[in-house]
Structures are given as C-alpha cells and as structure tokens.
C-alpha cells in the first residue's frame, strides 16, 4: 500500500458537516484495509483566489495509507460531493504523523486568541 496526503476544501456553508464527512472518508479507508496516520481540520481560512465567488473555505488534511481502489473510491466521492470545492491527492514516500506546518500556524493563532482573551476576562 502507498502513502498519500489528501487536502480538500469544503464550502463554508457546509462547515458543520465537515466532521461527518471526515468520519465517512475515514470509514471508507479503514473498511478497505487502509490506515489513517493523521487527520487535521485546519478550519475556515482565506482562499488564495475566489472559487465559485467564495473568499473563504474550510480546509481538511489527511495522511493515509491505502491501495489504488480505495483511492479511486475516495476521489470519486470528492468529485461528486457538491460541498467539496477542490481536492488534492499527493503520493508520499512515507507516512507523515507529526503536525503539518499549516496546523502549527493554526495552533499559534489559537494561542494568540486565548492570550488576548485572558486579559479582558481578568479586567471584568
């Protein structure tokens, strides 16, 4: 089996459906004997360019190990899901299990928001 990194972008109006979508894709992978090494929900982020007149979208990254038939099934699911605006599947040499640079940035932003919220709570 080969290792892949999958990133897909979901319509921002469908953000609440993302956990269910992730579970559906994870069950597809594991039911065919594949493995999931990393799943990262990057949240709603600014797009580099407008897609379908949208400036923001919900990003999800998955690192998996599966065979070609499972990958074909996933790609088919991405193509025919109207909520998925774009998807990218990249073949990797080995499994990536650590946090991605994008996830580190998301964690940094959340830490800044938490630090900014604490002084206002202390003043109240």
UniProtKB/Swiss-Prot annotation:
Keyword presence, Ribosomal protein: yes
Regions of compositional bias (Low complexity) in chain numbering: 114-124
GO MF annotation: an example: structural constituent of ribosome
Keyword Ribonucleoprotein: yes
GO annotation terms (biological process): translation
GO cellular component: cytosolic small ribosomal subunit
UniProt-listed Pfam families: Ribosomal_S6
InterPro entries: Ribosomal_bS6, Ribosomal_bS6_sf, Ribosomal_S6_plastid/chlpt, Transl_elong_EF1B/ribsomal_bS6
Role summary: Binds together with bS18 to 16S ribosomal RNA.
UniProt xrefs under HAMAP family: Ribosomal_bS6
Protein family (similarity comment): Belongs to the bacterial ribosomal protein bS6 family.
Listed name of the protein: Small ribosomal subunit protein bS6
Organism: Burkholderia mallei (strain ATCC 23344)
Gene coding for it: rpsF
């Amino acid at each position: 089996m080969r290792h892949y990194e999958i990133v897909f972008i979901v319509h921002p109006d469908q953000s609440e459906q993302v956990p269910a979508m992730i579970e559906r894709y994870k069950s597809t992978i594991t039911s065919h004997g594949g493995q999931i090494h990393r799943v990262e929900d990057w949240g709603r982020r600014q797009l580099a360019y407008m897609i379908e007149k949208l400036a923001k979208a919900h990003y999800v990254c998955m690192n998996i190990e599966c065979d070609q038939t499972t990958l074909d099934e996933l790609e088919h699911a991405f193509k025919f899901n109207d909520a998925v605006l774009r998807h990218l599947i990249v073949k990797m040499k080995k499994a990536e299990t650590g946090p991605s640079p994008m996830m580190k940035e998301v964690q940094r932003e959340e830490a800044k928001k938490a630090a900014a919220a604490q002084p206002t709570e202390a003043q109240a």
